[in-house]
Amino acid sequence: MRNIGIIINKEKDKENEILNLVILKVKEYLNPDEIKVIDQFYKGDYKDLMALDLLIVLGGDGTLLGVARKFSTVIDTPILGINIGNLGFLVTAEISELDEALYRIKVGDYKVEERMLLSCTIEGVTCSEERALNDIVVARGTLSRMAQYEVFINDELYATFKGDGVIISTPVGSTAYSFSAGGPLIMPDLQIVSIVPICPHTPNSRPMIIDGNNKVRVKPLINESDVFVTIDGQKALKLEKHNEVLIKKAKEFFRIISFDNKSYFKVLRKKLFKIE
């Protein structure tokens, strides 16, 4: 691999100790022509990133989500996620496994898996499409009253319910907020979407799973409630009356490196169920 980029969550490595270690190890194992350290809030020319053969992301799940949201529309470089954070459910390896991970990449003992992304636009608002690796949440503000929501699938009304909100989740996001709200766990390589009501006050409001090629439209009936759309828990936009949230499968994918010894169920048991 000739060109390698590194993105690090500086809040978790203020003295650059981890960054310097990773640069040293990358040179030792992969001997690249160039190593480019990229700020996670990068505002430069994205053309500079298109030549990367590998992007190493140092942080936790939040850092990976931010990278997916920010860079997925401009580069399709395989990503090696190294956990230096807390949960690290989405990452490829822990920092203690760095040597093994780089060696496996050196000898080609890895695979690149594609993860589904969601695309989100707000009807009635001039804004760019947003991308989400985990979920799009349409929900009331913290101090707001309960709101009512209409959910359409391919422009046909699916349900109307009162509650705190609704989560539109990818398979990757099924282990996040959706899981806490009673949504199903979904194998990450599937191309499906779950629709999960949050604290519904309407009888028989249950999660729904649909094919990823379907389009979802959420119409909050806003009266006295403040309602927001939140992308991967990182970016929030307040909705006004008559705004509708349009959600569909993005044309891009999040491409992450994985190893055969890290099975999905093994990670579930260890990090979600706390079973070794």
From Swiss-Prot:
The keyword Kinase applies. Its cofactor is a divalent metal cation. Disulfide bonds: none annotated. It catalyses: NAD(+) + ATP = ADP + NADP(+) + H(+). It comes from the Bacteria. GO terms for molecular function: ATP binding; metal ion binding; NAD binding; NAD+ kinase activity. It is found in: Cytoplasm. This is NAD kinase. GO terms for cellular component: cytoplasm.
